[in-house]
From Swiss-Prot:
NCBIfam families: tRNA uracil 4-sulfurtransferase ThiI. Keywords: ATP-binding, Cytoplasm, Nucleotide-binding, RNA-binding, Thiamine biosynthesis, Transferase, tRNA-binding. This is Probable tRNA sulfurtransferase. The keyword RNA-binding applies. Pathway: Cofactor biosynthesis; thiamine diphosphate biosynthesis. It is found in: Cytoplasm. PANTHER family: TRNA SULFURTRANSFERASE. Catalyzes the ATP-dependent transfer of a sulfur to tRNA to produce 4-thiouridine in position 8 of tRNAs, which functions as a near-UV photosensor. Also catalyzes the transfer of sulfur to the sulfur carrier protein ThiS, forming ThiS-thiocarboxylate. This is a step in the synthesis of thiazole, in the thiamine biosynthesis pathway. The sulfur is donated as persulfide by IscS. Its EC number is 2.8.1.4. Belongs to the ThiI family.
Amino acid sequence: MMKYDHILVRYGEMTTKGKNRSKFVSTLKDNVKFKLKKFPNIKINATHDRMYIELNGEDHEAIAESLKDVFGIHKFNLAMKVPSELEEIKKGALAAFLLIKKPVKTFKITVHRSYKHFPMQTMELLPEIGGYVLENTEDIMVDVHNPDVNIRIEIRSGYSYIMCDERMGAGGLPVGVGGKVMVLLSGGIDSPVAAYLTMKRGVSVEAVHFHSPPFTSERAKQKVIDLAQELTKYCKRVTLHLVPFTEVQKTINKEIPSSYTMTVMRRMMMRITERIAEERNALAITTGESLGQVASQTLDSMHTINEVTNYPVLRPLITMDKLEIIKIANEIGTYDISIRPYEDCCTVFTPANPATKPKREKASRFEAKYDFTPLLEQAVANTETMVLQTVDKAEEDQFEDLF
């Protein structure tokens, strides 16, 4: 029985990039190669308009499952490559149709003849191929307007592609074409979604997490590591910077009026993140803030917090409500990790009545009464950095079985 031997990838938004298109295509090819490195027999050919993945016996479903998380892919088709001969095309169309797993009652044939010397015209091919499918199936009808399946055939010189199983890609742009940002990764629901949406725009991310032992536990730290690990599904790797924040936070709570401790804490986080960003050649800072969600996420708060950094602060979730954010978190696999009941440093020292309209002048005046510089430098110097890469699910299961 014939089976899929190719996957054809369509780029989507990348096609609008003009002179930079070759860079985008090259980056996408590198990302796909990295994502599919566990399939040693495949061959990848990335052209100006499309990417062709030759399977060479590898499992098409496993490859399709990996491809769906690669940013820069609009859609992809499971395909068969057959000689450009009528009988072979007919057999291929039937075989592709029979591989469809969902219930199908109607179909249509679409033919694109880029090889104009093929001996039959498109309007001659449609009934010929469609009739062959009808003759060899039962309870199936042709519906050219709203079919359950569209059997698409591309006829070229020497060979043709036949496809009818179309899958959606992740969309966006290839990770790596848009520079690098530092993402404040708290361990909550919002910040992993912000990281995901930032990567979707082609930006590489490194994560910064502030932890305050013994007020925050090792389990809370592991939760953030697991979140960063989950995000590697969408890129080659995530570098995670774990910043010890205990002394800074204790000093803030001692020296700063309680209504401003949250604001000053955020300002200190921004200062530390900016220093790490400078060392790592990042160009911006991403946060998971959503306008009005909590006291520290009002416009006044953001205005006051932004004062301490010259870096652009990206807020992908700024107009989303909580349910929209949770929906994405569920889709990308971070929600169940985020809701593990472990405290982070933003919640263990939460004041009873935080200022919702903090002023820059007040925050600066409160900070000026104590020299925080040595504490910030110590936090940066003692930051632990780890690099996380995608773990194959089968390998992960095998590892867990050892215990």
